[in-house]
């Protein structure tokens, strides 16, 4: 039910917003905004690096955040990568995986989409690591998360179109893609 409800919301709201954003925003600006949202996620990545005892990654993440938040103008530019500090991604679902927690059942969460039980729990914990959760008011957070949602949905326009045009069953294709994508992320 949530899969098709999310699909309807995507078709009626999120995809048109993402297409409008793509049409109105030059590609370099779209990339800059994507980098800025990536930068805002670095405190979450840092916390999970520490929990996974990956101290070199944690030092890199902290350095990237400091450099890109200042010299990179709030993350619009990835100055840290130019200095050799390459980005990586991690979350609390990956932290749980590192401690041996299995996937659990496949879920489709309202608005958040497909995930597993482990990663759904990770979403909740990651929100506690996110400074936006405790530094911003609810309306500012909603505006910021909505903006990030549009930016992220724009990045997926072509992939989603390909999937919906070529899959026999959208539900099964998304489920398989979710597990494949997550498996790739877990083994990096």
Which residues does each PLM region occupy?
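Membrane interface segments of multi-pass transport proteins and intramembrane proteases
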Residues: 12-28
């Amino acid at each position: 039910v949530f899969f098709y409800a999310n699909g309807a919301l995507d078709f009626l709201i999120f995809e048109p917003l993402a297409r409008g954003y793509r049409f109105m925003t030059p590609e370099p600006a779209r990339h800059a905004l994507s980098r800025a949202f990536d930068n805002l996620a670095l405190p979450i990545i840092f916390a999970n690096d520490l929990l996974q005892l990956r101290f070199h990654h944690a030092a890199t993440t902290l350095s990237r955040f400091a450099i890109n938040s200042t010299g990179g103008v709030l993350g619009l530019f990835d100055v840290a990568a130019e200095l050799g500090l390459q980005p990586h991604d991690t979350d609390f679902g990956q932290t749980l995986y590192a401690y041996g927690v299995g996937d659990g059942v496949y879920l489709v969460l309202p608005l958040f989409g497909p995930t597993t039980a482990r990663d759904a729990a990770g979403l909740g914990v990651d929100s506690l690591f996110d400074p936006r959760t405790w530094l911003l008011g609810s309306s500012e957070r909603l505006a910021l998360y909505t903006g990030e949602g549009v930016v992220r949905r724009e990045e997926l326009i072509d992939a989603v179109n390909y999937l919906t045009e070529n899959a026999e069953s959208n539900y099964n294709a998304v489920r398989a893609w979710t597990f494949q994508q997550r498996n790739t992320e877990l083994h990096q």
